[in-house]
Amino acid sequence: MPPFRRQVDDERHVPDIPEIRSDFAFHMEGSQDIDAWVGMFLDDLRRQRLDENTIVFFFSDHGGCLPRGKGFVYETGTHVPFIVYLPPKWRHLANGQSGRTDRLIGFPDLAPTVLSLAGIEPPAYMQGKAFLGEYEAAPKRYEFAVKANQASHYCPERAVTDGRYKYIVRYIPYKHDALMNAYQWGMPGNICWDETYLGGRCRSAVCPMTFERHCAELFFDLAEDPYEIDNRMDDPACAEEIRRLRSEMSRFLRDTGDLGFFLKAQRLTPTPLCEILRDEGYDYERLYRLAELSSKVTPESLPYLTECLASPRKEIRYWAVVNINQLAATGQIAKVPEAFAGLLGTDDPEIAAEAAYAMCLTGRSEEAMAYLTAAGPNGRLDSHKLTMLELLTLAPDAGSYFTGDVRRTVRAVVAADPRQTA
């Protein structure tokens, strides 16, 4: 069997359709090209007699557009190839490490490691830890992964692993992996996965997974399930490991001052946002608690969430809306607070569009869809409205929202500017 075909056969986390096979084969061919390209540089080092004085790092970034690859916190999106070669005269800097290792490292560790190899102590403010050299740190127990903006869709996720077990938390659980962005959906595999599912031609258990509403939390045993398909969150045998990794994730947010829960527009400031917040003495704890609440929110939290809707802080209002949306998406409430209707008339398009989602789910779709389909003075729909309309197309009762008038309005806007389909 040809090597590419054999490797594609092993991709159990994606449906077996020709376009996905083609995308994977194309990626593997590119990997072979890179291998030859790296060989040219190594040969050049030898020709210049620099090879015995050069420490070589070889690694990739997080990939291109393969389905469930870059942009997702599954291992297929975060686990990259990484090789370090130390010539014999510098091998003592490996401190006895050789061959393959299961040691956990991440890209923040690269700069401290290079400093350590040069005999320079990494400064304490660096988040990463050196894994080679004079100032090598003790191996880490945990490695973390972050999903921030996914093109036009804001859907933050975080993950933590100890190498064996993996915990993922999705802070906006009602959003789907199948929400498109122009970068990844430029590949045939993603497009045809959509067409296969929406056309009712699914033949694979993994085919519907990206179209289902997210579980708020996921837990995987990577030794038994390296493709992260079997979510073990409800397995009593995993309860202690889940508690441990959930606690580590909560600690990570606070230790790093994670800014990913501020909206994109808030982070586009001339002065770095972290400096602004530091000078204000910002209360991160309230924000993190609100974001973490979304995975376990119940109607008992509604009075507090309604209070948060009146906060002067945009990010607090936004995360209050997210929690109320989650209550609506999981059928825990039949109506939203009356303050939601007022959000549609505010100058906060991110919050207004998000609020329209829960209004659709709780019997107020007419006014919500009127807002979402109202074009601006330039005749275009803003990106926040478009992303929420896309999310609503995946709702179980989407047909009741996209009536004839709504469809005609959306088609007219898109026809006037086809770029808005992304």
Language-model-derived ranges and their functions:
Residues 28, 35, 39-42, 46, ...:
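Non-transmembrane alpha-helical segments in soluble domains
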Residues 82, 130, 143, 231-232, ...:
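Conserved beta-strand positions that form and line the central face of beta-propeller blades
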Residues 52-54, 98-162, 240-243, 247:
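Polar, surface-exposed loop/tail segments
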Residues 75, 151-234, 241, 272:
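C-terminal, low-complexity/hydrophilic appendages and adjacent surface loops
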Residues 1-105, 116-124, 186-189, 194, ...:
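Active-site-proximal cap/lid insertion segments
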Residues 42-45, 49, 87, 117-122, ...:
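A generic secondary-structure signal for well-formed alpha-helical elements
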Residues 202, 207-216, 224, 232-422:
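Long, internal low-complexity/basic segments
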